[in-house]
């Protein structure tokens, strides 16, 4: 695993001790990655991917505002109950981007589904199962009203998929969480586990948020 030190080398970041963060555990069936598409122009991680090769149940709570991002509109349109991939980009919220923002997601989804399908065909399982466009959802955070950086994100997708890994430790969870940050001063992670019936349920939380104006 390579840690991108540029995630932490900026004026707004306040380095925290590792002990301040909870130790998130490995989640079976989940692969994660975080890379730089150079959206900030400084090489820090700005794309994160959560991939469930066998699929995962999906639920969401979203804004009640009538003005939503093209990313949220994409997710709402298909009424998904299960997914295989969630890609998160920072720097650009894909809001007030109109047709360009919508078409950008179409391009990214087509390319990401193709690359993930190719990955599966080369896996030890040797599966030929297709990762479909409708198996993917997206999250975008950052500034509004700016053209969505589709070409930079598209060019970074092969590296994003190549860097997927199944083994997760605290440092890797923090790397992925750092790839979502905008003006946040540090990554945000949380962990809890409960016994449900006879089973141990692990709950890992990764979040971002800073300087939001009346979020709803």
Identify the role of each PLM range:
Residues 1-65:
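N-terminal amphipathic/basic leader segments beginning at the initiator methionine
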Residues 48-51, 73, 86-89, 137:
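Short, conserved beta-strand segments within well-ordered enzyme catalytic domains
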Residues 57, 61-78, 182-196, 201:
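Glycine-rich oxoanion-binding loops at beta->alpha junctions
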Residues 57-59, 81, 94-97, 145-148:
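Short active-site-adjacent helix-start/loop capping segments
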Residues 82-89, 216:
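Residues forming anionic-ligand binding surfaces in small-molecule and nucleic-acid pockets
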Residues 90-118:
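Alpha-helical support elements that line or immediately flank enzyme active sites
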Residues 111-117, 133-216:
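Glycine-rich, mobile lid/loop segments that gate access to catalytic sites or pores
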Residues 118-132:
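Intrinsic disorder/low-complexity segments
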């Amino acid at each position: 695993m390579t840690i991108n030190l540029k995630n932490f080398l900026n004026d707004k970041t306040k380095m925290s001790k590792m002990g301040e963060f909870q130790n998130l555990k490995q989640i079976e069936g989940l692969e994660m990655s975080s890379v730089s598409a150079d959206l900030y122009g400084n090489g820090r991680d700005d794309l994160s991917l959560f991939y469930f090769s066998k699929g995962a149940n999906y639920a969401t709570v979203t804004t009640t505002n009538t003005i939503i991002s093209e990313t949220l509109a994409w997710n709402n349109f298909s009424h998904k109950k299960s997914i295989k991939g969630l890609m998160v980009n920072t720097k650009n919220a894909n809001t007030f981007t109109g047709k360009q923002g919508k078409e950008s997601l179409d391009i990214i989804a087509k390319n990401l589904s193709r690359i993930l399908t190719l990955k599966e065909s080369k896996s030890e399982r040797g599966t030929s199962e297709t990762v479909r466009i409708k198996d993917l959802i997206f999250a975008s955070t950052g500034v509004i009203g700016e053209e969505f950086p589709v070409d930079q994100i598209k060019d970074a997708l092969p590296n994003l998929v190549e860097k997927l890994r199944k083994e997760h430790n605290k440092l890797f969870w923090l790397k992925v969480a750092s790839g979502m940050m905008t003006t946040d001063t540090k990554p945000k992670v949380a962990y809890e586990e409960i016994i449900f019936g006879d089973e141990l349920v692990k709950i890992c939380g990764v979040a971002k948020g800073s300087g939001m104006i009346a979020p709803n």
